[in-house]
C-alpha cells in the first residue's frame, strides 16, 4: 500500500488503470494487487486483494471487489515465470508512453538511461492485455531483464524486492522524461562513448548498489510517513 502511494507521490498514476503486485512471502503462488477502482493515493492494506496465478481471489477484505484483468494477465505471467521477481510495477506515464512510441526506443543520453543500456526489453502492443494468450510472448520478450518498455503502452519493471522494483521504475521514468525533453529541444543530441555506456550499466548492476536501493526506498517511504495510519489499515 505504501508503494502505491509513493508511485502517486511521484505522479506516475493513470486514474485507476495501472497496477503493482507483490508476491506473498509464505505463499509463493499468490500475490497482492490493487482492488480495481481505488486511487493509488487512497490505497490501504485492506484494499489489496490476494489472488493466485490462476486469477482466483484467495483473500479480500471487501468481498466481490474486482481486480484489473489486464493487471492479472501481466503480473501473474511474470510472477509465475520468474519466482525470484517478487514485485512488479506497471505505469502509463505520458513520458513513458511517448518513449514507447518512438521507434528508436530508449536512447543512452542520460545517466538514468545508461543504467538500462542493453538491459531493457521491448514488447509489441497487442491491444489491452485481457487474454492469457499474450503471457507467453510477454515473458519471452522480458527475458532476464528487470525493465521492459511496452510499445505504445507504457513501462514495466520488476525486482526481487520492493526497493529494487521501485528504483527500476523511478530511473526508467526519469530516463524517459529526460529523453522527451531533450528531443523536444530540436538540437543535435550528444551520445556518450560505447565503453562509457557499458561501464555505467555495469556500475548500476553491481551488488554494491543494493544498500543504495534500500536507502532510496527508505527515503521515499519517509515522504509519506504522515500517512502511515491510513495506508497500514
Protein language model regions, located:
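Glycine-rich flexible loops
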Residues: 1-233
